[in-house]
């Protein structure tokens, strides 16, 4: 019986727009930001940023180092990065509120402080309450200094939540993350970004 749901954020709760953010970085003199940006797991200094190994300031300095324009501002970098994320859709917000009445909801996300701050601010502007109110706990890679698909982050999250993996549904769009969670006994749902959110979640809960 499913008691807990662990949601990924980017690609599951929040739609991603990779091309839009790559175009924004190109306008800042960075032609190869795609070498670092991945919908599932970042690379290079971006991976270190999401793992909490470097600060937002250090991340921005790394961006400037690969740009043809060393004078780009913090705001320009943040805005370009945040274009990767669409707002959380209304039907997903409504379903999370509904699920919260029956299940213990958690966020388990490879994330960074720039994007996470942006999502929280945008969510509150759109819905009038804080994103964190939907969840028992929000597990973010940059705060935990560990990232999916490492088993460590799953085990740490389960321990903090006091949850049993066999009673926990994990929803993610990354096959590697799903494989890692399944190996630890989670009930899993490989999310398809081309299919409706509510339909996939309801099916996963029914099958679990």
Protein language model annotation of sequence segments:
Residues 104-108, 112-114:
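Structured, non-catalytic alpha/beta "coupling" segments that mediate domain-domain communication
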Residues 2-90, 101, 112, 203:
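N-terminal helical cap/lid subdomain that shapes the substrate entry/recognition surface
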Residues 102-104, 186:
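A generic structural motif
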Residues 101-102, 134:
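Structured helix-beta-strand junction loops
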Residues 82-86, 117, 146:
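Short, flexible loop segments at the rims of nucleotide/cofactor-binding pockets, characterized by
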Residues 20-23, 44, 58, 62, ...:
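Alpha-helical elements of Rossmann-like donor-binding domains used by nucleotide-donor carbohydrate transfer enzymes
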Residues 1-3, 113, 119-208:
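Asp-based, Mg2+/Mn2+-dependent phosphohydrolase catalytic module
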Residues 8-11, 52, 99, 107, ...:
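Generic structural signal for small/hydrophobic residues in well-ordered secondary structure
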């Amino acid at each position: 019986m499913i008691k807990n749901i662990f949601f990924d954020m980017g690609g599951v709760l929040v739609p991603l727009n990779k091309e839009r953010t790559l175009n924004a970085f190109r306008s800042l003199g960075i032609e190869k930001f795609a070498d670092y940006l991945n919908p599932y797991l970042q690379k290079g200094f971006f991976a270190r940023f999401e793992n909490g190994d470097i600060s937002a300031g250090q991340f921005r300095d790394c961006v400037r180092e690969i740009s043809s324009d060393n004078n780009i501002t913090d705001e320009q970098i943040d805005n370009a990065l945040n274009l990767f994320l669409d707002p959380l859709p209304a039907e997903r917000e409504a379903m999370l509120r509904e699920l919260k009445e029956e299940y213990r909801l958690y966020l388990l996300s490879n994330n960074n402080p720039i994007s996470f701050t942006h999502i929280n601010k945008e969510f509150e502007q759109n819905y009038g309450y804080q994103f964190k109110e939907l969840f028992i706990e929000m597990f973010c890679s940059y705060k935990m200094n560990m990232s999916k698909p490492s088993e460590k982050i799953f085990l740490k999250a389960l321990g903090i939540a006091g949850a049993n993996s066999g009673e926990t549904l994990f929803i993610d769009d990354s096959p590697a993350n799903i494989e890692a969670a399944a190996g630890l006994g989670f009930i899993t749902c490989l999310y398809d970004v081309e299919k409706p959110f509510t339909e996939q979640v309801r099916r996963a809960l029914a099958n679990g």
